[in-house]
Amino acid sequence: MQLSQSDLSAESELRWLRSRTKPRSADTYRNALPMPENHAMDSPTDLLDFATRHPRLLVLTGAGCSTGAGIPDYRDANGEWKRSAPMQFQLFVGNELARRRYWARSMIGWRTMSQATPTAAHRALVRLESAGRIALLVTQNVDGLHNAAGSRDVVDLHGRIDTVCCMGCGTRSRRLALQQELSQRNPHWALLDARSGPDGDADLEHQDFARFDVPACTVCGGMLKPDVVFFGESVPRERVAAVRAALAGADALLVAGSSLMVYSGYRFVEDAVAAGKPVAVVNIGRTRADAVLTLKVDHDVSTALDALATRLGA
C-alpha cells in the first residue's frame, strides 16, 4: 500500500510529537494530590504489621514488579519518564505512519516480552493469594506475568500485550501468530535490535517505517491493535467496576512497584482514602500518593513481597 502525501509529510511531526510530549490521557494527572519532596520511609517490618492488621488486601501492581524479568520500568525515582512517550491512542488510529512505526518497534520489543518469566514479586503474590490474603490482584502491567506465575484472580487493567484485537470486528487473536507474520513480511527488520520498553515497544529509530508491512485483520480486513489500553484510551468500565467492588470488601489497598502517576491506577487510591481504608505502597522513589499514604516502604518490591509472604507463613 502506498502512503498518502499527508502520511509522509506527517513523519517529521510524528518524530517531534514523540520526542517532546509527555503521555496524558483524559484521566492522567486529574485531581492530583501534592507530592512532597520528603516523606518518612517505613521498613519492610512495618509492612508485615500492616498486612497483619489488614488481612484482606486489594493489591495493585506496576512496572516495578517486572523489572527483575528484564522488562524496563517507565519512570525514575523522581517519577520522571525514562524514555520517549508511549504510543497515544489518537495517533495510532489516525496516522498510518504512526501505526507502521509502532508495529515495527513492537516486533523488536516482543522478543523481550515473550521471553520474560515471573519474578520473586510475582511468585510472592501467588503465595499470598493461596493463603487467602488477597481480595483481588490488579495489575497495570501488560506482560501477563501474574498469570504466568500462577495467580488465579487477576484484573489486567490495561490489557495484555500477548493478544491482538481488530478495531473493526473485535476479533481477538494471539500475538505470537501476528509476530510470525510480521517477521515473514519484514524479514530484514527481524534482524534489527533495540532496547525494549515496559509496554512491548522498542527504542528503534532512524528507519524508513513507511516500508514496514503491517497485515490487516484476516476476518474483516480491519485495523489491528495490541489488546492494551494506550494513553488517551479509556480503561473498560467493567474492569474499573470489578476493582471497585473488590476494594469495597477489602481491608486495605497495597500498591506494589508503581509510582501511581497515571490516573487509571491512582483512582483506586482516591477510592480507598474516600472510604477510610488505609493505603500502603512498596516502591523505590516518589509516588503520586505520598501525601495520603498510611505506609511507604522505599524498598525493592521483590525482596519486600517475598519477605512478607515468608513472614506470614504463605
Which sequence ranges carry the predicted segments?
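Conserved catalytic core of sirtuin-type NAD+-dependent deacylases
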Residues: 2-314
